[in-house]
């Protein structure tokens, strides 16, 4: 069976690199897509979510923030602000970030950066959800 190579990159460098991917599932702004070897070349915007990576012998989840994916016949390149493998997520830290974001959203006196707080809450909830998928 032909496989994909997959690379997830953030501004801090490569976070994940694998050569034997059978299927990758991603959340794009147009909905969830699955990518296998031979997929039509595509570029898509990604939402905060996860990448599920299936390979012979198992699967892995990576929490990702907004970004882009470039699909080629045999290669998948994911470029995001942040990416974190499920088994490396510090759930306590994610819970703390969630509490801070909720506190900021509930503070009626300070409604500046409401969108930033909403995105922070969405990222924290995503990290908690992905950590529980492993």
Swiss-Prot record:
HAMAP family: ATP_synth_epsil_bac. The gene is atpC. GO terms for cellular component: plasma membrane; proton-transporting ATP synthase complex. F-type ATPases have 2 components, CF(1) - the catalytic core - and CF(0) - the membrane proton channel. CF(1) has five subunits: alpha(3), beta(3), gamma(1), delta(1), epsilon(1). CF(0) has three main subunits: a, b and c. This is ATP synthase epsilon chain. GO terms for molecular function: ATP binding; proton-transporting ATP synthase activity, rotational mechanism. Belongs to the ATPase epsilon chain family. It comes from Staphylococcus saprophyticus subsp. saprophyticus (strain ATCC 15305 / DSM 20229 / NCIMB 8711 / NCTC 7292 / S-41). SUPFAM superfamilies: Epsilon subunit of F1F0-ATP synthase C-terminal domain (SSF46604), Epsilon subunit of F1F0-ATP synthase N-terminal domain (SSF51344). Produces ATP from ADP in the presence of a proton gradient across the membrane. The keyword Nucleotide-binding does not apply.
